[in-house]
């Protein structure tokens, strides 16, 4: 995982040099692979730090997790992101039913989307410095939240969903074409997101191509979920899909 030092400083007040910060991160068990200085047109002098995080530190696969460790060490104030409440303005057009392998599954419908709009430059810079390519505002904001909070999000094109959503295991013979165009034959233990007609995502790993966001997308269902780590870990290995979402969801977060 790599990140901007200036972005980290928004979450925890650290006044040490980049070199000292890297030494302290390593002592805290977050080994620094490398770092490089960067001059930002938006935030001034900055550094990009790359960590080699071990599987037992799943709580540090986010800026907030790293900031929490540094806050405890330095005795500095931890500043949580301040969410803005957005009241519901439309009725939910569908229902969601889940199984026990999805202890938490929530989402929000967002309409009147214009993908001709550009991602704000600061968000674009931060995800680029973190090793992600800026694609469009929807993908960019899901990656931003993933990096900052460690919570994977997935956006479905609402107009491509047919009926209610389900979190379930496959029916015999079901298949799914993923966003990377890989076609997979689903096993009995492959946890899925489906609508009433078909599978639409391999839960916690990758969405399906058929319901993916495109330049013509106007409405989305934005998913935020926690799946039991064992249900994700085995499938990620089986299909050789170690995605940024599956890495985080397959680890136990503290």
Positions of predicted regions on the chain:
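RNA/tRNA-interacting regions in translation and RNA-turnover enzymes
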Residues: 1-252
